[in-house]
């Protein structure tokens, strides 16, 4: 074996230095094979770990011995039954001999401390599989070693064995009782049962002695520690004592949750724990707080016992005193942050939180009034210190009591639902104090820099603010007036202080504005729209709202706050965070400016000058672009034409389009695709849309409007042409292409700011001058597209811009659609065809009859294009998915055409010859059970066809549709047989969810046929079609009757059951 061991040790050395040898992988595979074969190789590993030299030092290097422990762990990890006697004796004797030589007589792995922890875990695994039946004396054997020794005579206890004992108990507790560890590993019923048996055995045999040993070692070392502190003793000895106390309390805390509480909470342990909770050593204090937390959280069967435990502990008083003490120390430190001491306050907060939660459980679940009363009183006593923790400047500490506050407020809310009477004074006092703390905590730290978007602390503050809002909302549901009155008072005080010239910190100013911002959310009794800001009569007729002078009505509380906000000039506070919060607030409550129109101008002035859009900070401006857009959009009807002109004239410098190329983050990505994704430009687009909105408000003077629009877009079209010429000249620079893309998008957004073209206008000259400008824009964009249609971003931008221009200018520009289609489809990617058809569908929805001529030219080539695509075999899942999406978009387009009553394009002189082929291709889609969504759309199309062309000759209601000669034969000979046939196909699964949609659509189609053709259709089903399919006369009559008499919902249900029943039979 010695030679094999030497080979293994050598392989471990090679595998530990991957860069040093070409044999690394071979060595690694060799030792991994040994580890995976642990059932056969554990003896070898054991020898490597325990072997000694002649001087009793360890024979093999630490990394080899560490690996040996891993093999032993592999061997023991899943042993849930006793070991065979020989294996057990070998392991037991080797381990005890090792402990005797290394921990009792030796240095306890002083040169390789990492082995100590690994050995503790290995020995724990051996304990778990042998304690119950083979090694019941495990702890007795261990206790016998914690005896005086020459190297530890000063304390009377062996320090190394004491620490090993602590580590072992910690490991054992982790394995058999730590829920976090259990949750992290794969569930095993055998392991779970074994762990339960081990817990029971420890409780029965050794729990008392384990607890006694732990507390004896702790108490002895506490005494020693105090003596050394008082006598200015040896620092090494003091450190050793502190280490033992620290690990001893950690060990105590590890088992208090699963052994008898009468062992751990005694007249001796409680004073010891509270003494250590205030010890000068931070690790000891932290360990003690955890131990106390676990005692408090321990489940006891009887609520009375839990309450008695709390009375014995008197934890509320202790925590109150410690909070006061640590808060005083915190104040004395000032700006000198002590992370350790802050972690101690956090630990105290966690202890308080768990204690409070346990009290709330007693209040909620107590079986007697006495227990409930005592627990409730203790909980009330805890409230002041809870609020002090919440008020801590360190959010990690403040957030420790969040669960307790949620529980208390939840209890108050439940009580409020039961009783509508006034809140008792104690609760109201607590809620008022809590609200004060919340409002204070909602302030930014004075040293914070909210402008820094990369500062993680800013994100944490925003998160904290949201958490605090949930508490405020909870108080709101309990006592709304308390919250609204306090928020209103603080906001108005802050605004008034600024207006009067009182010195005001920026974070106080920001909070004041923020409270106005959230007031609309918390003021649940406020009205909607204008009624939220002024006290209007109960009802104002809809036709009188536009002429009503709302300035005559008194303001609501929120209206008064907004008026004070605007009039105070606090937007000018020399801090961008305050200004931004102002702009966020006035934008959110744009309806206020409809009742106090005199406030519009000062708000707009602030938005436009250096306080807003012209601020030097780019991130600030980016947000302002959107807020300005939103404010103008909501207030456009209140802005006089002259003001709109003034605003437009103040913005030209902000409309300049700058292209800055940077290196793509992903080297594999397309540089142009990355270049057009500019967050700055995407925000700037809001500004272009705002220009469009403002220009559209000049509709009373259409000539002036048209001239203004031309003056705005002309520079962009000139720049468009200049960059197009650079591209045509063969420039390899991306900048001209990006510029063209950006300008097209900008022009599209200017168009977007105009209202949609009305379905019918009262004047032929409706905005005619502006429409002429939009036609010029469309022409300029088409010229660019013709030259650059190989570039996808240009095609995407063009499609977007044309959607907006067509929606605005309507029939004036529909003539550009055919060349637009030709250029867009000359080069396209799969997704673009879907986008194009969705684009046409949108235009049909907006322009209706004005799209007839365009669609008449479009439908035949588009159908050919789609047919060609769908006829190709898909080469992979991506292509198959694209084909399905293309099919759905095309079917949806056909349905949209029929819904818009543009069916004439199918039967026009241009398209009538190909109409039958189109119908045939759609019938084949109905028959394709591999794509149920497309089946459903095709059936929907045929349902509309029946309504449109299937009306009987001389139909009394021409609005429903017309009569296409011969179409009734197509209904009976093609549509109905196909619809019936698809649900009868062997491959059609009526139980599938998507197939169910198809069944419902077939049912709807059949009812449409009957309702459209009347008695002729019923006779056809009863006398011809159903008998031809072999239906008995009685069954055919029942079906036809239900088809005629049931409403659509009930017939769908009947038809579904019929299809499913036919399959099962």
Curated annotation (Swiss-Prot):
Gene responsible for this protein: LOS1
Record-level GO cellular component terms: cytoplasm; nuclear matrix; nuclear pore
Protein's job: tRNA nucleus export receptor which facilitates tRNA translocation across the nuclear pore complex. Involved in pre-tRNA splicing, probably by affecting the interaction of pre-tRNA with splicing endonuclease.
Alphabetic keyword roster: Cytoplasm, Nucleus, RNA-binding, Transport, tRNA processing, tRNA-binding
Family: Belongs to the exportin family.
Gene Ontology BP, a term: tRNA re-export from nucleus
One GO molecular-function entry: tRNA binding
Location within or outside the cell: Nucleus; Cytoplasm
The protein, known as: Exportin-T
Source lineage: Eukaryota, Fungi, Dikarya, Basidiomycota, Agaricomycotina
Gene3D superfamilies linked to this entry: Leucine-rich Repeat Variant
The organism of origin for this protein: Coprinopsis cinerea (strain Okayama-7 / 130 / ATCC MYA-4618 / FGSC 9003) (Inky cap fungus)
Pfam families to which the protein is assigned, alphabetical: Exportin-T, Xpo1
């Amino acid at each position: 074996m010695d030679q094999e061991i030497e080979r293994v040790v050598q392989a471990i050395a090679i595998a530990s230095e991957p860069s040093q040898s070409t044999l690394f992988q071979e060595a690694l595979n060799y030792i991994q094979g040994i580890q995976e074969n642990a059932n056969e190789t554990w003896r070898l590993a054991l020898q490597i770990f325990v072997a000694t030299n002649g001087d009793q030092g360890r024979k093999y290097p630490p990394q080899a011995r560490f690996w040996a422990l891993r093999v032993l762990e592999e061997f023991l990890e899943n042993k849930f039954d006793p070991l065979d006697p020989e294996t057990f004796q070998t392991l037991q004797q080797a381990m005890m001999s090792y402990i005797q030589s290394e921990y009792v007589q030796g240095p306890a792995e002083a040169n390789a401390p990492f082995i100590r922890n690994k050995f503790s875990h290995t020995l724990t695994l051996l304990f778990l599989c042998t304690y119950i039946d083979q090694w019941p004396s495990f702890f007795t054997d261990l206790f016998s070693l914690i005896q005086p020794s020459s190297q530890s005579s000063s304390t009377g206890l062996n320090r190394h064995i004491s620490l090993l004992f602590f580590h072992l108990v910690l490991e054992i507790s982790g394995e058999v009782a730590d829920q976090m560890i259990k949750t992290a590993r794969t569930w095993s019923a055998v392991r779970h049962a074994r762990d339960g048996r081990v817990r029971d055995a420890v409780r029965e045999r050794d729990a008392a002695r384990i607890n006694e040993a732990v507390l004896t070692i702790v108490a002895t070392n506490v005494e020693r520690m105090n003596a050394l502190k008082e006598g200015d003793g040896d620092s090494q000895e003091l450190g050793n004592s502190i280490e033992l106390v620290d690990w001893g309390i950690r060990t105590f805390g590890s088992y208090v949750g699963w052994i008898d509480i009468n062992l751990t909470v005694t007249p001796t342990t409680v004073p010891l724990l509270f003494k250590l909770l205030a010890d000068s050593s931070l690790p000891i204090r932290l360990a003690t707080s955890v131990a106390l937390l676990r005692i408090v959280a321990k489940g006891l069967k009887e609520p009375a016992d839990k309450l008695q435990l709390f009375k014995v502990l008197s934890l509320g008083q202790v925590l109150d005193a410690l909070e006061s003490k640590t808060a005083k120390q915190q104040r004395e430190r000032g700006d000198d942050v002590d992370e350790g001491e802050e972690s101690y306050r956090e630990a105290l907060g966690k202890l308080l939180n768990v204690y409070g939660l346990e009290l709330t459980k007693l209040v909620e679940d107590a079986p007697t009034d006495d227990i409930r009363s005592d627990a409730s009183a203790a909980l009330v006593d805890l409230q002041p210190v809870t609020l002090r923790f919440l008020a801590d400047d360190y959010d990690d500490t403040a957030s420790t009591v969040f669960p307790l506050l949620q529980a208390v407020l939840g209890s108050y809310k439940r009580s409020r639902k039961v009783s509508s009477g006034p809140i008792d004074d104690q609760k109201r006092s607590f809620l008022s104090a809590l609200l004060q703390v919340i409002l204070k905590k909602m302030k930014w730290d004075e040293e914070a820099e909210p402008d820094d978007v990369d500062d993680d602390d800013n994100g944490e503050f925003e998160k904290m603010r949201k958490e605090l809002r949930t508490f405020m909302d909870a108080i709101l549901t309990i006592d709304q007036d308390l919250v609204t009155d306090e928020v209103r008072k603080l906001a108005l005080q802050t605004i008034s202080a600024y207006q009067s010239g009182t010195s005001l910190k920026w974070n106080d100013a920001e909070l004041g504005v923020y409270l106005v911002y959230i007031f609309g959310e918390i003021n649940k009794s406020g009205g909607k729209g204008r009624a939220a800001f002024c006290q209007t009569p109960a009802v104002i007729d809809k036709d009188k709202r536009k002429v009503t002078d709302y300035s005559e009505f008194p303001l609501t509380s929120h209206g008064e706050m907004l008026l004070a906000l605007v009039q105070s000039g606090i937007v000018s506070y020399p801090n961008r965070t305050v200004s931004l919060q102002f702009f966020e607030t006035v934008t959110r409550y744009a309806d206020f400016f409809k009742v106090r129109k005199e406030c519009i101008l000062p708000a707009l002035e602030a938005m436009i000058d250096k306080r807003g859009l012209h601020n030097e900070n780019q991130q600030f401006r980016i947000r302002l672009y959107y807020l300005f857009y939103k404010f103008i959009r909501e207030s456009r009807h209140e802005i006089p034409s002259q003001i709109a002109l003034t605003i437009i004239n103040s913005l030209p410098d902000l409309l300049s389009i700058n292209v800055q190329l940077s290196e793509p983050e992903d080297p594999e990505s397309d540089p142009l695709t990355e270049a057009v994704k500019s967050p700055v430009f995407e925000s700037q687009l809001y500004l272009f849309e705002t220009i469009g909105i403002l220009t559209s408000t000049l509709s009373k003077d259409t000539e002036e409007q048209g001239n203004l629009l031309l003056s705005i877009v002309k520079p962009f079209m000139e720049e468009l042409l200049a960059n197009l010429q650079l591209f045509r000249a063969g420039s390899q620079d991306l900048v001209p292409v990006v510029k063209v893309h950006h300008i097209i998008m900008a022009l599209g957004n200017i168009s977007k700011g105009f209202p949609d073209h009305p379905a019918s206008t009262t004047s032929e000259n409706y905005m005619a001058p502006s429409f002429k400008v939009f036609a010029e824009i469309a022409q300029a964009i088409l010229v660019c597209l013709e030259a650059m249609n190989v570039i996808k971003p240009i095609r995407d931008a063009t499609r977007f811009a044309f959607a907006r221009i067509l929606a605005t200018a309507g029939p004036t520009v529909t003539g550009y659609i055919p060349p637009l289609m030709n250029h867009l489809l000359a080069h396209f990617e799969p997704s673009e065809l879907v986008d194009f058809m969705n684009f046409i569908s949108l235009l049909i929805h907006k322009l209706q009859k004005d799209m007839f001529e365009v669609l008449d030219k479009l439908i035949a080539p588009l159908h050919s294009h789609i047919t060609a695509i769908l006829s190709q075999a898909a080469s992979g899942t991506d292509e198959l998915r694209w084909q399905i999406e293309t099919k759905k978009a095309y079917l949806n387009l056909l349905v949209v055409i029929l819904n818009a009553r543009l069916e004439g394009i199918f039967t026009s002189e241009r398209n009538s010859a190909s109409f039958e082929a189109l119908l045939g291709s759609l019938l084949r889609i109905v028959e394709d059970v591999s794509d149920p969504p497309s089946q459903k759309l095709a059936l929907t199309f045929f349902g509309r066809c029946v309504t449109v062309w299937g009306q009987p000759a001389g139909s009394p209601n021409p609005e429903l549709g017309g009569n296409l000669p011969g179409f009734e034969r197509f209904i009976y000979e093609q549509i109905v047989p196909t619809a019936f046939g698809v649900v009868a196909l062997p491959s059609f699964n009526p139980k599938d969810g998507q197939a169910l949609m198809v069944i419902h659509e077939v049912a709807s189609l059949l009812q449409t046929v009957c309702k459209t053709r009347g008695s002729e259709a019923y006779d056809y089903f009863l006398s011809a079609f159903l008998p031809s399919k072999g239906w008995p006369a009685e069954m055919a009559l029942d079906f036809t009757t239900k088809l005629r008499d049931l409403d659509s919902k009930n017939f769908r249900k009947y038809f579904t059951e019929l299809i499913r029943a036919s399959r099962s039979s």
